[in-house]
Amino acid sequence: MLEISSKTNLLEQKSYKYSLQDVAEPNLQRDVYSYGTIPKVAFNHRRVPMSMPEEIWITDTSLRDGQQSVEPYSVDQIVNIYKLLSKLGGPYGIIRQTEFFIYSKKDREAIEKCMALDLKFPEITSWIRATKEDFQLVHDLGIKETGILVSCSDYHIFKKMKMTRKQAMDYYLATVKEAFNAGVIPRCHLEDITRADFYGFVVPFVNELQRLSRDAGVPVKIRACDTMGYGVPYTE
């Protein structure tokens, strides 16, 4: 079927709709990611045209991901870093958002002190696991957007979560609905995407997220996380 593309305004073949490929055993892609050699790069010779957005900005993770590689920050350090991020980003919000942990009393105290500064940028967001209990913390703090950990490789789905692909997808979608119900914009962090079955899980999952977003009239953000650092900068 042909259709006018909303991206190119040209007549194109309608995109194929990928469906979830539920499997009994995990595909760990040992031919690519073996334990004995460096990861291999397979070429598919597909050119992906650049599509530059009208605006480019930074979403900062110094206060969340950054804390996982250094000694944990004190409340005063978090507040000072937040002030510096606002100053660096300027009045137009080049540094548009930043992420916070919310689990400890110290984390929540730091968020409350940063909120009290009433700075326009960077917007304070959080990062949580896909659980109802974590959403309650977000709601109680009055945060409008949160990152949600949605692991998408079979390594994580089968080995860490002890689920099948369908069970994981159903669980994630139910969690996103909880975000909608709480009045929170979900930002889905697709963990370990470079080791995931892209067309058998990632694309069908994102399609379902888009459907939920349309039905609810609430935006859903997607973050592609190259957790293991296996991504390459070229498209072919």
Give short role names for the model-derived ranges:
Residues 2-132:
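N-terminal capping/small domains of soluble enzymes
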Residues 23, 48, 53-58, 70-94, ...:
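Alpha/beta enzyme core
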